[in-house]
Amino acid sequence: MTVLTQPPEHFVFMKVGNHARENFDSILERKLKEYETTGKIFWGYGGVTCHPIHQVQPFARQFEKKGSLYLIMQYIDSNADPDLVPATQYSIDGITWHPIPRGITVTGSRYAMILSEIKPGDLIIYPSEYEVAVGRRRGRSADEYLRGHVDKGCFAKKLPSRAKKDKANQIKTSYQAEIVEPYSVFVR
């Protein structure tokens, strides 16, 4: 995987941190072992944004011909404490279910992003230069979309005539990973 030194034209953004009584460093260490063992990572997440079928998979298909799709992660101090039961199955379509591959653990999540290796990589993202690329909020400026409790989204660069670099509203990110097929799945 190539570590990005400039923000990409399109990406999935996610705030990440401690989860299910596990600190973020432990999660990263576990996920790197998953990658070494299986060649992929199931990065669990929940919430109402970045639904596998309605947002992530269509977004990935829309941009796959333009190059790799990345998950860009911003570390935050999180106290997410969901159910600790590990998922045992995943589904691409929400209908047909398969066992989670041996060596992969997804805890306290409804969905999982399918990733290659997670790499450190500092980027500065200006959300005002991007817009929501799929779903009901398509076309909405990413800076407006991320206000409040929204912690993830599928974003694409705005047309130059609509983009403005708002230096007061920047996001510093610390980690990145390439999103690989099937991009995002349901887990249970």
Set out the residue ranges of the language-model regions.
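Acidic, glycine-rich low-complexity segments with interspersed aromatic residues
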Residues: 17-77
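Short beta-strand-centered aromatic/proline hotspots
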Residues: 79-90
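Short, surface-exposed beta-edge/turn micro-motifs
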Residues: 9, 66-71, 79, 109-111
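Residue-identity detector for glutamine
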Residues: 6, 55-57, 62, 74, ...
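Contiguous surface segments at macromolecular interaction interfaces
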Residues: 1-22, 26, 92-188
